[in-house]
Every structure is written in C-alpha cells, then in structure tokens.
Amino acid sequence: MAIEKTNRINALFDFYEPLLTPKQMTYIGLYYRDDYSLGEIAENYEVSRQAVYDNIRRTEKILEEYESKLHLYRNFQLQSEELDNLLKYVEENYAYDKELLTRINRLESLEE
C-alpha cells in the first residue's frame, strides 16, 4: 500500500468520517489508521477477507466521491499553503511586527 494513498485516505477519512456508516468507519479506521490486515479485520468481525476488502474499496470510492463534490480536503490544502506563504512573507518583510506574527500564528493553530 503506497504511503501517499494511505495519507490521502486518512485525510479524506478525517474530513468525511461522519458521513460514513459505522461499519465503513470501523473497517477504514482499522485498515488505514490502525494498520490492521484484511485477515485481522475479517477474523475480528467474523466475515470473509473478501467482504472486508470489498467494503474498504467501496468506502475509498465513497470518500473520493465526497471529495470530488465538496472539496474540503483540497480547500484545506490550499488554505494551508497560502497561510504558509503569508507567514513566510510576513517573517521576511515584517519581522518587527510581533502583533502581526502573533495573529498569523493564531490562524495557523486554528487549522489544527
């Protein structure tokens, strides 16, 4: 499993988790966040590996569909990038303005 895919699914899961069913949340959470294998999940929930695999793949598609319509993750990335650019600019050009730096740092902490 590629690290980029894992990171993306985890990020999408963070944004869209409340829109998933309890089973989808459980399987995706165990597989991507907790690094369980398909076999471990199947054993814990007394279902086949194929059932777990199918559920996870369907849920990945659902998460991608939500993102294609709502763009929450993309917008978060763009806002983060712009905030980083703003902070860099202020540090380079207005380093003496402690109030401005403080306010930007507060904005950054709101993202977390």
Curated annotation (Swiss-Prot):
SUPFAM superfamilies: Sigma3 and sigma4 domains of RNA polymerase sigma factors
Family matches, as InterPro entries: RNA_pol_sigma_r3/r4-like (IPR013324), UPF0122 (IPR007394), UPF0122_fam_protein (IPR054831), WH-like_DNA-bd_sf (IPR036388)
Transmembrane segments: none
Region forming the signal peptide: none
Source organism, top-level taxon: Bacteria
Pfam families tied to this protein: UPF0122
Family: Belongs to the UPF0122 family.
Role, per record: Might take part in the signal recognition particle (SRP) pathway. This is inferred from the conservation of its genetic proximity to ftsY/ffh. May be a regulatory protein.
PANTHER family, per the entry: UPF0122 PROTEIN CBO2450/CLC_2298 (PTHR40083), UPF0122 PROTEIN YLXM (PTHR40083:SF1)
NCBIfam families: PRK00118.1-4, PRK00118.1-6, YlxM
Protein name in UniProt: UPF0122 protein LSL_0628
